């Protein structure tokens, strides 16, 4: 809709417009392409080995492909009027700064549901204005997001004390190695399944794990109890990953245990439980994770959020102002 509005505004002024939409993951590129197709907007791709049609007025490109030696010359020759960045909380990275430098006259629009960074770095060096959407509670009250029930560990629980004592690294978040040493054991993993069995048994959902080993062990645990669960991460081959996602959307898999795959852009509205098994100090990551379960679809009443690592005790409920 936004792209159509931009194109139509230029048409009224009898001008052509060229738009670049930038993403950082293949899954996001495919989802944006599907949305553009739904609105009848012709577009090309700048990503990997895909055939390029640079004459099309709308291009969807991955940030890494845009700056490769192979594409750099052709990209520089384009005269983009607009650069739209999806998941724009990443746009302070050097790669995006470099891309923006190639098109100093282009208008830039960053879109994100989580405009915060752990290092508190400001976005004002890139964007002049911040347009704030309503709070999550508004979207829930207006039936645009799903309502939820939230189940968390207690503030004085053993797991919460372990989280509070976990090592914090220079990024401002917990050390993955320390989290793995502390939480990737049979006793604590069994608590994940126990809470699933009590509050979300039979539901379709996503679990957020610390690392690949943690994800694999959780998937194995759930599978041993008859739950159709599989682990997925960034090293899962793209074709296998797509097969797993399709099987999940079709209901052939009930639970996907992931590592940093479904924090952004993943759209499967009938997900009706989320399980948090990875501690974090990042508010953005917290909201991205629970947000995967808040999409609405006909027949969906509520999402169950199982917080097994006490993120509620850091951030409150997802719909808090």
Task: Give short role names for the model-derived ranges.
Residues 30, 44-55, 71, 216-220, ...:
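Conserved helicase ATPase core of P-loop NTP-dependent helicases/translocases
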Residues 1-6, 208, 232, 257:
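Walker A/P-loop
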């Amino acid at each position: 809709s936004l792209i159509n509005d931009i194109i139509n505004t230029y048409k009224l002024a009898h001008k052509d417009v060229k738009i670049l939409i930038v993403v950082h993951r293949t899954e996001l590129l495919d989802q944006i392409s599907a949305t553009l197709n739904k609105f009848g907007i012709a577009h090309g791709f700048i990503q990997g080995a895909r055939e390029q049609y640079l004459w099309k007025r709308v291009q969807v490109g991955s940030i890494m492909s845009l700056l490769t030696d192979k594409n750099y010359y052709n990209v520089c020759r384009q005269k983009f009027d607009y650069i739209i960045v999806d998941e724009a909380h990443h746009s302070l990275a050097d790669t995006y700064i470099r891309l923006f430098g190639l098109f100093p006259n282009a208008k830039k629009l960053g879109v994100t549901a989580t405009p915060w960074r752990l290092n508190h770095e400001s976005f004002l060096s890139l964007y002049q204005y911040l347009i704030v959407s309503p709070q999550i509670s508004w979207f829930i009250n207006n039936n645009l997001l799903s309502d939820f029930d939230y189940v968390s560990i207690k503030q004085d629980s053993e797991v919460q004390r372990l989280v509070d004592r976990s090592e914090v690294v220079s990024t401002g978040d917990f050390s993955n190695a320390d989290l793995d040493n502390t939480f990737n054991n049979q006793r604590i993993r069994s608590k994940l399944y126990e809470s699933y069995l009590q509050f979300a048994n039979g539901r379709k959902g996503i679990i957020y794990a610390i690392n690949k080993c943690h994800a694999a062990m959780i998937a194995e645990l759930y599978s041993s109890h008859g739950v159709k669960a599989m682990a997925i991460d960034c090293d899962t081959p793209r074709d296998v990953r797509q097969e797993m996602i399709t099987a999940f959307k079709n209901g052939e898999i009930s639970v996907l245990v992931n590592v940093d795959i479904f924090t952004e852009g993943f759209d499967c509205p009938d997900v009706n439980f989320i399980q948090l098994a990875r501690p974090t100090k990042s508010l953005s990551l917290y909201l991205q994770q629970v947000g995967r379960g808040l999409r609405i679809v006909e027949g969906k009443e509520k999402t169950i959020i199982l917080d097994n690592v006490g993120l509620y005790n850091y951030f409150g409920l997802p719909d808090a102002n």
